[in-house]
C-alpha cells in the first residue's frame, strides 16, 4: 500500500539522556481505506516546538512503525529531507519541513547522535513503505540511484549553506577500459556513471565500508588526474591517498571546468590487467568495445585452434548456460565453440536467424532428462541489446529428443566436432521451454510474451504460431516461412552499430512453390517427413570447418548451415561412404532465412521441376533456383559452389560456407586440376591481413566481414572496398572435370547420366555486374558454380532445354554477396577424386570432355563471328587504310593499350580458324597485338610478391581472374601524380590482363624471347612512368544486352564513397566513373567502341580501383556511327641526358593522333569535326545530365607541342631493334631495353582521367635517373594533380626543365610553388608556358588577389644564378647562403638566460661575439608532418630567413642570421636584443605607467613596422604584444619594434591547423574558421586592433574565458574586448575598425599609420601647453 499523505505528530520521549526532549513522530495515514493508526498524546510544549520549527541540534526524531498499536521507535531519517510535517492542531495551516541538517551536532558532546553520514545515502531517495515497514539502509543502498545525492550545498530556509562539508565525484563502475577502435585511445565504456557525494572528512576505512554497503562488494577506488589517460589511474589505498585525492578535487573545483572522475574496480581484479584489452587483436578489441558500449557482458575469448573458430563475443555466463552440466552432455572440451551473439530484448528490426553453435558430437544418448535440468537465471544486462534475440536459460536444441537419438549411432560420430546452426525462433525461447515439463507448457508459459512481442513485431517477423509449430511438429506454411525484412545490424571495424534498411517484400525471383522448400526453421522431424531418406542431421546443420591458420573471424549472421565437414585424418576419410554421404543433399539442402527463402528441390517428377524452372525463367529471366545450398555442392566439388542471390536484401543471411576441401572427400582415382586465384603476395585489401596461400591445402581463407557500402563511411579503407573490381578473365577455354555426383542426380530417360554427373567447366569470361550491396567481387570460380548448377538443372529435363536456357545464362550469373575473401589454395598433387561411377572408365571421361569442349568452342565461335560480321566490310576498309598510312613508320611498334572484352577473350582461345578466312586471321592478330605480353608468367604479372617494405596492403590490382598483387606505388609513380604530391593516393594501378596464361601450380620458365622478358621484367626494372600515349573514349549509346558480360541490364550501383575524390580531395563529385575508356593504339589497328560499354547505361556503375574496363577490338570508327574523343597528350621526358634515349622519349617525337584528333598541332580544335564544339564532346563523354560541368581550356597542347627537345631517334630504328628480338609486332624491344606496359588508370567521379600513363621499365635508366625524378617530378606532383579541378582532361605535359632551372624560373617570377600551383589551377596555365624564358609573362599572370600570401620578397638581390652556377641545386640552405644570408655557428653563441618559451620555440638572451642578441631555438615540432611537408616547411624557413636578412627598418627587429647546427640538428634564429623585452612584460608591471602619449608612440612604431613588412609581402600571422619588443629607457621616446618574424608561414600552418590557445584572442575570424582561402594581410590588422586594446587597458583579452567560447565569439562576431568608457573616440573608432569581422572593412597599415599620426599631432599642442603651464606656474604674477 502506498501512503498518499501522512500526518506526523510529536510525542514526548521520556528519558533519552540529559533530559533532552526529543520528538517522537507518529504517522497517521490518511486517505487509506484499510488503515488508521492511533494518534499519540502530545504535550503542548512539544507541539509548540514543532509548530515553530524549533528543533535543536540535540533533538532526535523518532516515529511509529506501521501495524503496531503501541508503536515502535525508528529514526526520523526514514523521512526524506524536507518532508512536510503537519501539526495536529491545525494540519492545514501549521506545517514545517524536516530540517536538512537534523542530527548534525556542533558540540563535542559524545551523547549527541550524528546522523549526517547515515543520511548521506538516503537523501532525496523516494522511500516506499514495503509492507508497512520502513526499509533499512542496507536494502536501499543496493542501488546507486540512492547513493549520496548531495544536498549539502542547498541552503536551508534560513539561508545557511554548507559548501565545504561534502564533495562530489563523477564515479564510474561496472565498465571497462578499452581502446576505441577508431584511434586506439583508451575509453571507459559500459557500466554506469553517477555523481556521488561523500563527506570531506571521511577516512579511507569509512569510504571503503560505504562502498561495500552501497555496491555489495569490495572495490578498488581509483581516480583520474587531469590531462592523464586512463592507463595512469591513481589508486586510493590509504588515508594519505584519499587526502591527495581531495587536494586534486579542490584544484578542479576552483577551476570549475571539470569534475574529478573516480572509478570503482572489483577488488579481486586489476584495472590494467583485466579491463584494458592488451591482447593485440584488433578485431577482438573492437568487438569488446562494441559489446561494452552496448551493455553486453564480457566476451568469451575467441580462439582459433584445433579447427574450431570461436565466433561468439558473448560468454555463456550471460546467457545463463551451464554447458558443463551432465544432463546436457555438453562437456566443454578443447573443441567447444563459444555461444553466438545473443542479447536480452526482442527487437523486430533486427535479424531473424540467431545462430547458436554448439557441439553435437558430444551429445550423450540420454537426452530425455533435459526437462529436469535446472534453469539458470539470466544475467543479461538491461542496457540496449546489440542483437535481438532472447535466450534466458539452457541451450535449446532443435526438435524433439528422439530426433537426435540417431546421432550416437551415426557413421559420422567419430569425425570430430560438429556444429549446429540454430534458427532464431528456436533461440528465442528461454530456459523454461526446455527446462520445463514439455513443449505444451512452454507454449503456455510464453503466451503472454508472444502477445506482447507480436504487437510490435512487423508483418514480416515470425509470429507466435511459428514458435508453436516448432513443437507441434507439423508442416509450416510458406507464409510462415517466408521471413524477410529485418536484418542483422552490421558492426564495422570501428565499432559503429548500423541498422540496415528493411526489405519486407520478397523479390520476384523468390516466389517458389512452398512444397519445394524446406525451411531452416523446420524441426528435424519435419525435414525427415519431407525427406524420408533420413539425411543425417549433421550433414544439413554443420558449419564449414574454417581455415585454422587464418587470423579471421566469421560474423554471426554468416553462421549458416553447410554440408561441409571438419577436417579429418586420412583413416577417417576411408571410413566414409561417399554415396551415402552425398545422397540427396541437393534435395535436402536448407534454404536460408532472409529476404529470399527458397528451398531445395525435393524428390519428385523431374519433368515437372524442369517445367517449373522454365516458367520461372519466363517470368523472370534473372531467376535462378535458390534451392541449392552451399553444402549440396561442397560435398562433391572441391571448389565451393554457391547460389547467387540476385535482388536480395543487402543484409539477408547468405550461405556463408563454401566448399569441402578435396582432402576431406573419399579417395579414388584423381583428376589433375589446379585452382589459382591469388598470387602468393596477395594482401587482403579490406584489412591488410596477408592471406596465406598453402600450395598443399585446399582450404579457404576468410577475411573479416564488414558493413555494406552505404554504412561503411567510417571504415579506414572503405573507399577501396566500395568499388567494383571487375575482373576480366582472359583464360583460354578449357575444362576442369568436376564431379557433381548424386546430389544433382535425377533419373531421366532423355539425358545421359554422364552428362550431368560430370559437368564441364568452361572458363567463360564473366563481367561482374555490380551489386550495390556486394562488398567484394566474387571470384571467377563462384560464378562458374552457379553456371554449372543452372546448366545441370536444364539438362535434367530435355536435351533441348539446355539451348533454351543458354540465352539467360549470362543474365542470371549475378554476383553473390560474400562476407569473406575467396582465396583458393594451390593444391599441388592433391586433387578432387572422381565420382565412383567413373572410377573404372576414365577414358570415357576424357572422350566426353573432348566432345563437350568442341561443342562449347563451336558455340563461342559462332557467337563471336556473328557479332562482328555486321560491320566487317567497313571495319576492314578502315583498318587497311590506317595500316597503309602508317606502314612505313609504325610497323611493329608497340600496339598500344587495349582493354579486352568478351570477344577478345573468347576468340583468343578458340584455336585455329580456317586458314582461308582473313577475318579470323585479322581477329587473331588484333588479339595478339592487344596482348603483347600474353605469355608472360604469373611471377611477372601478379604472382610476384613485392618486398614487404614496398607493399601497400590497402591497394591491390587484379590481373586476370586469378592473379592479384599489391600495387607498388613506388613503381607506379606518375610524375608525382599523387594528389598533392604526398605519395599516398596512388590508389589504382591495373596491370593489363594477359591472355594465354595457364592455370598451373608451378610455372615453367619459357625459352627464347619470353625467357628474356621473364628475366628482365623484375621489380627492380620498373621505371617512373614518363609517357602517356593516347586516350580514347567510346560513346556508343546503344546497349546490346547479350554483349554485356553477363551483367544484367538493370544492374545499378548506389553512390559508394563520399563526394570527395581520392586524389587529395580536390575533385568534385559530379558523377561516377565513366566506363568504356580504352587506350588507343599508336599503330597497327584502330579501336572501335565496344557495344557493351554504353555510357548512359553504365554511368551509374562505379569503376573501382584496379578495374579493367571492357572494350572490344576496334577496326574503324565512322562506320559504326560513333564519335571518338582522342586526346593526344604526352608527358615529355625530362630535360636530362638520362632520358634522352628512352623509349618513351623517342616515341613522343611522333604525332600519335590517328582518328581525327580533338586538337591539332596548333593546339586548337580539329576543324574536321564538323563544327562539333568541345561541350558536345563533353556531352558525348559524360551525358547531358552531368551537373556543373567544367569545360577545359580551349587550347590543349598537342603531342607536337610537347615533343622532347633531346630526342631524334626514328621509330623505324626502334622497330628494327624490336624485330631483331624475334617478337615482330607483338613487342617492341631491343637487347638492352624491355618496356613493360602498365596502365595506371583511375577514373575520378567526375569522369576525369587522373592517371593514365605508360611506364617505361628500362632498369638502367631508372636507377640512373632516380634522384632527378624524385626531385623534379616529385615536387611537381601536386601541381599536376591540381590541374584536374578545372580541366576535364588534366593531362598537361611535364616540365622539360632540369631541377635547378625549375627553381630558377620560380625564383625569377617571384613565386613559390604554392602560388604557382594556385595559378595553374585557377587560370589553366600549362606547364609549357612555365618553360618560357620570359618569366615576366608568367609573373604578370599571378592572381593579384592572392599576392598577399606570397611569402617571398620581390626585391631579392639578383644573385640567383650564383646558387645555380655553383651547383647548389635545390638545397634551400645553400641557396639562402648564396643570396647573402648569414649563418652563425652554434659554438659562437653564448646563452645567458631564458627569456620565455612559446608555441614555436624558446627565446634566450645571449651573446654573439660580445653583442647582446636574442636566440630563438625553434622546436622540431614546427616542421612535423609527412616528409614532403617537412621538406617544404624547411624550405619556407630558409626562404623567409633569407628575406628577413634583407629587411632593414627601424621598427623591425634586426635579423642577424640562422644557426643551422643547433643541438639535435635544430634550427635557431639570432636577432636584435631589446632590453625591456616584450610589450606584454612592460604592461604587466604595475609600477610602470604608460600615458596616452607613450601609447600613441608605441602604436605608431608598430604600425610603421607592419606597413614595411606588408610592403615586402610578408604577413606576420602572430602580431600581439608579446611579439612587439620595446626599449623604454628613454622616458620621453619609447621605441617599439616588430619581432618574431622567423616562422611566419610555419606559424600560419600550425595555428590554422591546430589553433593555439595563447594566440586565439589575436587571431582573425578567417583564421579560426579554417577557410585559408580568405587569408590576407588583414589578419595582421585584426591582431593590431587587439594590441591597441591591450595598450589601452594593460590587460590580456578574454583572460578568464574558455577557448571554445573565444573561438565561437570571434567567428560569429559576437565577442570583442570591452572598451572602457574613458577611451578616446578616435582611438575607439580605429580600434573597432581594425577588429571588424569583414577583412575588407579593416584599414591597411598605411591608413592606420596616418590616423595615428593625426592623433599624435592633435595631442602635441595639449602636451606643449601643459609643459608651458608647468614652467610658468604663476602666469598672472608675471603679467603683473
UniProtKB/Swiss-Prot annotation:
GO annotation, cellular component aspect: cytoplasm
Keyword Transferase assigned: yes
Sites where the protein binds ATP: 1395-1403, 1416
BP-aspect Gene Ontology terms: auxin-activated signaling pathway; cellular response to auxin stimulus; regulation of auxin mediated signaling pathway; regulation of photosynthesis; response to absence of light; response to auxin; response to blue light; response to red light
Listed Basic and acidic residues bias regions: 446-482, 1339-1354
Catalytic reaction list: L-seryl-[protein] + ATP = O-phospho-L-seryl-[protein] + ADP + H(+); L-threonyl-[protein] + ATP = O-phospho-L-threonyl-[protein] + ADP + H(+)
Subcellular location, principal: cytoplasm
Occurrences of domain PB1 (ranges): 166-267
EC number: 2.7.11.1
Effect on the protein upon substituting residue 1248 to A: Ability to correct slow growth and starch accumulation defects in plants lacking PRAF
Superkingdom of this protein's organism: Eukaryota
Region feature Disordered, mapped onto this chain: 86-163, 363-388, 417-516, 556-580, 594-613, 641-672, 700-725, 1186-1226, 1339-1372, 1661-1680
Compositional bias segments (type: Low complexity): 366-388, 560-580, 603-613, 1204-1217
Keywords attached to this entry: ATP-binding, Auxin signaling pathway, Cytoplasm, Kinase, Nucleotide-binding, Phosphoprotein, Serine/threonine-protein kinase, Transferase
CDD domains: PB1_UP2 (cd06410), STKc_MAP3K-like (cd13999)
Domain Protein kinase: 1389-1655
Sequence intervals crossing the membrane: none
UniProt-recorded Gene Ontology molecular function terms: ATP binding; protein kinase activity; protein serine/threonine kinase activity
Active site per UniProt: 1518 (proton acceptor)
Function: RAF-like protein kinase acting as a central mediator of a fast response pathway to auxin involving proteins phosphorylation, and leading to rapid cellular responses including membrane depolarization and cytoplasmic streaming. Required for general growth and developmental process. Photosynthesis signaling kinase involved in the regulation of the sucrose metabolism involving PGM1. Necessary for optimal chloroplast electron transport rate (ETR).
Protein family: Belongs to the protein kinase superfamily. Ser/Thr protein kinase family.
Protein name: RAF-like serine/threonine-protein kinase PRAF
Species in which this protein is naturally found: Marchantia polymorpha
Originating gene: PRAF
Amino acid at each position: 500500500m502506498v501512503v498518499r499523505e501522512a500526518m506526523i505528530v510529536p510525542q514526548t520521549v521520556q528519558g533519552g539522556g540529559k533530559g533532552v526532549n526529543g520528538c517522537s513522530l507518529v504517522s497517521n495515514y490518511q486517505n487509506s481505506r484499510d488503515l488508521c493508526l492511533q494518534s499519540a498524546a502530545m504535550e503542548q510544549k512539544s507541539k509548540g516546538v514543532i509548530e515553530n520549527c524549533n528543533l535543536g541540534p540535540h533533538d532526535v526524531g523518532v516515529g511509529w512503525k506501521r501495524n503496531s498499536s503501541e508503536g515502535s521507535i525508528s529514526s526520523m531519517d526514514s523521512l526524506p529531507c524536507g518532508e512536510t510535517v503537519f501539526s495536529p492542531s491545525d494540519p492545514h495551516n501549521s506545517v514545517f519541513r524536516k530540517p536538512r541538517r537534523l542530527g548534525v551536532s556542533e558540540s563535542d558532546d559524545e551523547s549527541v547522535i550524528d546522523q549526517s553520514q547515515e543520511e548521506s545515502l538516503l537523501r532525496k531517495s523516494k522511500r516506499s513503505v514495503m509492507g508497512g515497514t520502513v526499509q533499512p539502509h542496507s536494502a536501499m543502498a543496493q542501488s546507486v540511484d540512492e547513493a549520496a545525492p548531495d544536498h549539502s550545498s542547498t541552503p536551508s530556509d534560513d539561508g545557511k549553506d554548507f559548501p565545504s562539508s561534502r564533495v562530489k565525484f563523477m564515479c564510474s563502475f561496472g565498465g571497462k577500459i578499452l581502446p576505441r577502435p577508431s584511434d586506439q585511445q583508451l575509453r571507459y565504456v559500459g557500466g554506469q556513471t553517477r555523481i556521488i557525494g561523500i563527506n570531506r572528512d571521511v577516512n579511507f576505512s569509512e569510504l571503503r565500508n560505504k562502498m561495500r554497503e552501497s555496491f555489495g562488494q569490495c572495490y578498488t577506488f581509483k581516480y583520474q588526474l587531469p590531462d592523464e589517460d586512463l592507463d595512469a589511474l591513481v589508486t586510493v589505498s590509504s588515508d594519505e591517498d584519499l587526502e591527495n585525492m581531495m587536494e586534486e578535487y579542490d584544484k578542479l573545483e576552483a577551476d570549475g571546468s571539470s569534475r574529478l572522475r573516480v572509478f570503482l574496480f572489483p577488488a579481486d581484479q586489476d584495472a590494467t590487467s583485466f579491463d584494458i584489452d592488451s591482447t593485440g587483436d584488433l578485431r577482438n578489441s573492437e568487438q569488446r568495445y562494441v559489446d561494452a558500449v552496448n551493455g553486453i557482458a564480457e566476451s568469451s575469448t575467441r580462439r582459433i585452434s584445433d579447427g574450431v573458430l570461436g565466433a561468439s563475443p558473448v560468454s555463456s555466463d550471460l546467457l545463463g548456460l551451464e554447458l558443463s552440466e551432465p544432463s546436457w552432455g555438453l562437456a566443454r572440451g578443447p573443441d567447444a565453440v563459444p555461444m553466438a551473439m545473443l542479447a536480452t530484448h526482442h527487437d523486430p528490426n533486427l535479424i531473424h536467424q540467431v545462430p547458436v553453435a554448439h557441439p553435437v558430437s558430444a551429445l550423450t544418448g540420454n537426452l530425455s532428462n533435459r526437462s529436469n535440468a535446472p534453469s539458470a537465471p539470466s544475467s543479461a544486462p538491461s542496457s540496449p541489446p546489440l542483437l535481438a534475440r532472447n535466450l534466458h536459460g539452457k541451450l535449446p536444441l532443435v526438435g524433439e529428443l528422439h530426433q537426435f537419438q540417431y546421432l550416437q549411432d551415426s557413421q559420422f560420430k567419430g569425425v570430430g566436432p560438429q556444429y549446429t546452426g540454430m534458427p532464431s525462433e528456436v533461440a528465442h525461447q528461454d530456459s523454461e521451454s526446455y527446462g520445463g515439463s514439455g513443449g505444451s507448457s512452454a507454449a503456455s508459459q510464453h503466451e503472454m510474451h508472444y502477445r506482447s512481442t507480436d504487437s510490435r513485431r512487423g508483418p514480416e517477423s515470425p509470429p507466435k504460431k511459428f514458435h508453436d509449430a516448432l513443437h507441434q511438429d507439423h508442416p509450416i506454411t510458406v507464409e510462415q516461412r517466408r521471413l524477410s525484412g529485418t536484418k542483422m545490424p552490421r558492426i564495422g571495424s570501428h565499432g559503429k552499430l548500423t541498422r540496415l534498411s528493411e526489405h519486407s517484400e520478397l523479390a520476384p525471383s523468390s516466389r517458389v512453390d512452398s512444397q519445394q522448400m524446406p525451411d531452416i526453421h523446420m524441426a528435424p522431424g519435419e525435414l525427415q517427413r519431407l525427406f524420408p531418406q533420413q539425411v543425417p542431421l549433421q550433414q544439413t546443420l554443420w558449419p564449414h570447418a574454417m581455415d585454422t591458420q587464418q587470423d579471421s573471424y566469421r560474423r554471426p549472421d554468416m553462421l549458416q548451415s553447410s554440408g561441409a565437414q571438419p577436417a579429418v585424418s586420412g583413416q577417417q576419410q576411408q571410413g566414409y561412404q561417399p554415396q551415402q554421404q552425398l545422397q540427396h543433399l541437393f534435395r535436402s539442402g536448407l534454404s536460408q532465412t532472409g529476404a529470399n527463402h527458397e528451398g531445395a528441390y525435393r524428390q519428385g517428377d523431374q519433368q515437372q521441376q524442369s517445367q517449373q524452372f522454365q516458367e520461372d525463367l519466363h517470368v523472370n529471366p534473372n531467376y535462378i533456383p535458390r534451392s541449392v545450398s552451399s553444402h549440396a555442392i561442397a560435398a562433391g566439388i572441391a571448389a565451393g559452389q554457391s547460389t547467387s542471390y540476385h535482388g536480395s536484401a543487402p543484409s539477408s543471411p547468405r550461405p556463408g560456407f563454401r566448399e569441402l576441401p578435396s582432402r576431406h572427400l573419399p579417395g579414388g582415382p584423381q583428376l589433375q586440376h589446379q585452382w589459382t586465384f591469388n598470387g602468393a603476395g596477395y594482401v587482403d585489401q579490406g584489412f591488410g591481413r596477408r592471406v596465406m596461400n598453402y600450395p598443399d591445402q585446399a582450404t579457404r581463407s576468410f577475411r573479416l566481414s564488414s558493413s555494406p557500402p552505404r554504412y561503411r563511411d567510417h571504415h579506414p579503407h572503405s573507399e577501396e572496398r566500395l568499388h567494383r573490381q571487375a575482373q576480366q578473365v582472359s583464360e583460354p577455354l578449357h575444362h576442369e572435370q568436376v564431379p557433381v555426383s548424386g546430389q544433382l542426380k535425377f533419373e531421366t530417360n532423355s539425358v545421359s547420366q554422364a552428362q550431368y554427373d560430370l559437368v564441364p567447366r568452361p572458363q567463360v569470361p564473366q563481367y561482374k555486374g555490380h551489386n550495390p550491396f556486394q562488398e567484394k567481387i566474387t571470384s571467377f570460380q563462384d560464378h562458374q558454380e552457379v553456371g554449372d548448377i543452372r546448366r545441370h538443372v536444364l539438362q535434367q529435363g530435355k536435351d533441348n532445354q539446355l539451348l533454351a536456357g543458354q540465352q539467360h545464362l549470362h543474365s542470371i550469373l549475378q554476383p553473390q554477396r560474400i562476407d569473406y575473401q575467396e582465396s583458393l589454395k594451390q593444391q599441388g598433387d592433391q586433387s578432387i577424386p572422381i565420382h565412383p561411377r567413373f572410377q573404372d572408365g576414365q577414358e570415357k571421361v576424357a572422350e566426353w570432355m573432348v566432345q563437350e569442349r568442341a561443342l562449347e568452342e563451336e558455340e563461342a565461335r559462332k557467337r563471336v563471328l556473328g557479332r562482328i560480321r555486321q560491320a566487317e566490310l567497313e571495319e576492314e576498309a578502315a583498318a587497311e587504310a590506317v595500316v597503309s598510312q602508317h606502314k612505313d613508320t609504325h610497323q611493329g611498334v608497340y600496339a598500344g593499350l587495349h582493354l579486352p572484352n568478351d570477344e577478345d577473350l573468347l576468340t583468343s582461345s578458340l584455336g585455329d580458324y580456317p586458314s582461308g578466312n582473313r577475318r579470323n586471321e585479322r581477329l587473331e592478330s588484333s588479339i595478339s597485338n592487344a596482348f603483347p605480353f600474353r605469355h608472360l608468367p604469373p611471377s611477372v604479372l601478379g604472382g610476384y610478391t613485392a618486398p614487404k617494405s614496398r607493399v601497400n596492403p590497402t591497394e591491390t590490382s587484379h590481373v586476370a581472374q586469378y592473379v592479384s598483387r599489391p600495387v607498388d606505388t613506388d613503381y607506379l609513380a606518375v610524375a608525382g601524380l599523387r594528389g598533392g604530391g604526398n605519395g599516398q593516393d596512388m590508389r589504382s594501378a591495373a596491370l593489363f590482363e594477359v591472355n594465354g596464361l595457364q592455370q598451373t601450380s608451378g610455372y615453367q620458365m619459357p625459352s627464347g624471347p619470353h625467357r628474356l622478358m621473364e628475366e628482365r621484367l623484375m621489380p627492380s626494372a620498373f621505371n617512373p612512368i614518363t609517357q602517356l600515349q593516347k586516350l580514347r573514349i567510346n560513346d556508343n549509346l546503344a546497349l546490346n544486352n547479350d554483349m554485356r558480360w553477363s551483367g544484367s541490364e538493370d544492374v545499378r550501383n548506389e553512390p559508394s564513397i563520399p563526394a570527395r575524390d581520392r586524389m587529395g580531395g580536390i575533385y568534385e563529385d559530379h558523377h561516377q566513373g565513366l566506363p568504356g575508356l580504352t587506350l588507343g593504339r599508336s599503330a597497327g589497328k584502330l579501336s572501335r567502341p565496344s557495344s557493351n560499354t554504353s555510357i548512359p547505361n553504365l554511368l551509374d556503375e562505379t569503376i573501382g580501383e584496379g578495374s579493367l574496363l571492357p572494350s572490344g577490338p576496334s577496326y574503324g570508327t565512322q562506320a559504326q556511327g560513333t564519335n571518338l574523343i582522342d586526346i593526344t597528350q604526352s608527358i615529355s621526358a625530362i630535360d636530362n641526358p638520362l632520358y634522352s634515349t628512352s623509349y618513351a622519349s623517342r616515341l613522343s617525337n611522333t604525332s600519335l593522333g590517328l582518328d581525327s584528333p580533338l586538337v591539332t598541332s596548333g593546339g586548337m580544335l580539329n576543324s574536321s569535326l564538323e563544327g562539333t564544339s568541345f561541350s558536345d564532346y563533353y556531352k558525348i563523354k559524360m551525358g547531358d545530365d552531368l551537373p556543373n560541368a567544367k569545360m577545359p581550356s580551349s587550347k590543349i597542347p598537342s603531342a607536337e607541342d610537347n615533343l622532347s627537345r633531346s630526342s631524334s631517334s626514328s621509330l623505324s630504328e626502334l622497330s628494327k631493334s624490336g624485330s631483331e628480338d624475334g617478337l615482330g609486332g607483338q613487342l617492341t624491344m631491343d637487347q638492352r631495353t624491355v618496356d613493360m606496359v602498365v596502365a595506371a588508370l583511375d577514373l575520378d567521379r567526375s569522369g576525369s582521367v587522373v592517371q593514365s600513363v605508360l611506364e617505361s621499365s628500362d632498369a638502367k635508366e631508372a636507377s640512373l635517373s632516380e634522384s632527378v625524378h624524385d626531385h623534379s617530378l616529385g615536387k611537381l606532383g601536386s601541381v599536376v594533380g591540381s590541374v584536374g579541378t578545372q580541366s576535364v582532361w588534366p593531362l598537361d605535359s611535364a616540365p622539360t626543365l632540369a631541377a635547378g632551372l625549375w627553381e630558377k624560373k620560380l625564383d625569377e617570377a617571384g613565386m613559390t610553388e604554392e602560388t604557382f600551383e594556385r595559378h595553374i589551377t585557377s587560370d589553366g596555365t600549362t606547364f609549357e608556358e612555365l618553360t618560357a624564358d620570359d618569366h615576366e609573362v608568367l609573373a604578370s599572370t599571378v592572381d593579384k588577389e592572392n599576392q598577399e600570401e606570397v611569402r617571398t620578397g620581390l626585391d631579392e638581390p639578383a644573385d640567383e644564378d650564383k646558387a645555380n652556377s655553383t651547383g647548389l641545386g635545390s638545397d634551400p640552405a645553400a641557396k639562402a647562403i648564396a643570396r647573402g644570408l648569414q649563418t652563425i655557428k652554434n659554438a659562437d653563441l653564448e646563452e645567458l638566460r631564458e627569456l620565455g618559451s612559446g608555441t614555436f620555440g624558446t627565446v634566450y638572451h645571449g651573446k654573439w661575439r660580445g653583442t647582446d642578441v636574442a636566440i630563438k631555438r625553434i622546436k622540431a615540432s614546427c616542421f612535423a608532418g609527412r616528409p614532403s611537408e617537412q621538406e617544404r616547411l624547411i624550405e619556407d624557413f630558409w626562404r623567409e630567413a633569407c628575406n628577413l636578412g634583407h629587411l632593414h627598418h627601424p621598427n623591425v627587429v634586426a635579423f642577424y642570421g640562422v644557426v643551422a647546427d643547433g643541438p639535435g640538428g635544430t634550427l635557431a634564429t639570432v636577432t636584435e636584443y631589446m632590453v625591456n623585452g616584450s610589450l606584454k612584460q612592460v604592461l604587466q608591471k604595475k609600477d610602470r605607467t604608460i600615458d596616452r602619449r607613450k601609447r600613441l608612440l608605441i602604436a605608431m612604431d608598430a604600425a610603421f613596422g607592419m606597413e614595411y613588412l606588408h610592403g615586402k609581402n610578408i604577413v606576420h600571422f602572430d602580431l600581439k604584444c608579446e611579439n612587439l619588443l620595446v626599449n623604454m629607457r628613454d622616458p620621453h621616446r619609447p621605441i617599439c619594434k616588430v619581432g618574431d618574424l622567423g616562422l611566419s608561414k610555419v606559424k600560419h600552418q600550425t595555428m590554422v591547423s591546430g589553433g593555439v590557445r595563447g594566440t586565439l584572442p589575436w587571431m582573425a575570424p578567417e583564421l579560426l574558421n579554417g577557410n585559408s582561402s580568405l587569408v590576407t594581410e588583414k589578419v595582421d590588422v585584426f591582431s593590431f586592433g587587439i594590441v591597441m586594446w591591450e595598450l589601452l587597458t594593460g590587460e590580456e583579452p578574454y583572460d578568464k574565458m574558455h577557448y571554445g567560447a573565444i573561438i565561437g565569439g570571434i567567428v560569429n562576431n559576437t565577442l570583442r574586448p570591452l572598451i572602457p568608457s574613458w577611451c578616446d573616440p578616435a582611438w575607439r573608432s580605429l580600434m573597432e575598425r581594425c577588429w571588424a569581422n569583414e577583412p575588407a572593412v579593416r584599414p591597411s597599415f598605411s591608413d592606420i599609420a596616418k590616423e595615428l599620426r593625426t592623433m599624435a599631432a592633435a595631442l602635441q599642442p595639449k602636451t606643449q601647453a601643459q609643459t608651458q603651464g608647468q614652467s610658468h606656474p604663476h602666469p598672472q604674477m608675471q603679467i603683473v
